[in-house]
């Protein structure tokens, strides 16, 4: 991994999800792939705190690994049904107030036991991946149409974090600039978490300022 940084002439990130973490998904990849496009406005890849301390420097990913990760969704196409992968990253302050999001295709029915996945307590996993970006979690609802409700993770109550931790699994995803968290969920879980959040006394505010 250090060799990659030498070639790119950048320092290893202070906070990182390593290539080892990313490579764990390669055994799940198969030859059936359908590429999809991700709109991304590349920046310097450096994120600092208020004091200028470098929190994160983007990880260079080999092209072959990048292509495999981008196309991995169809590799498990036969193993899941009515399942949505969704990821987003919010870049604020230093990088700008923008949200990148993408929806992958609903997958077919099957057995999930053999899928290589990361299941961890939500705060630990998401803070590790997204906090350096001052980013958010994203909850995707499906009700005839697909629409995202992007909220600040830090604004979630403990019981909401616990519920999501117990009902959602997460995959890592990376493109050539950023590392994302991908939420794996089902229609039933989506409806339940939607109800939970809808019953809040004070609705969560999305990044664009809308309730």
Curated annotation (Swiss-Prot):
Name under which the protein is recorded: Uncharacterized protein ORF211
Organism: Acidianus two-tailed virus (ATV)
């Amino acid at each position: 991994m250090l060799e990659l940084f030498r070639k790119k002439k950048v320092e290893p990130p202070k906070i990182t999800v390593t290539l080892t973490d990313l490579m764990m998904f390669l055994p799940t990849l198969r030859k059936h792939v359908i590429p999809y496009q991700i709109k991304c406005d590349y920046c310097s890849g450096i994120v600092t705190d208020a004091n200028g301390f470098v929190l994160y420097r983007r990880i260079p990913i080999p092209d072959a690994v990048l292509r495999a990760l981008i196309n991995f969704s169809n590799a498990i196409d036969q193993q899941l049904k009515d399942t949505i992968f969704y990821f987003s990253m919010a870049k604020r302050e230093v990088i700008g107030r923008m949200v990148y999001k993408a929806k992958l295709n609903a997958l077919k029915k099957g057995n999930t036991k053999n899928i290589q996945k990361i299941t961890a307590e939500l705060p630990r996993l998401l803070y590790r991946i997204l906090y350096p970006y001052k980013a958010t979690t994203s909850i995707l609802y499906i009700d005839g149409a697909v629409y995202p409700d992007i909220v600040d993770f830090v604004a979630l109550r403990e019981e909401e974090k616990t519920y999501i931790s117990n009902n959602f699994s997460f995959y890592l995803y990376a493109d050539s600039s950023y590392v994302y968290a991908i939420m794996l969920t089902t229609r039933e879980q989506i409806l339940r978490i939607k109800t939970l959040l809808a019953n809040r006394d004070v609705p969560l505010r999305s990044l664009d300022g809308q309730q």
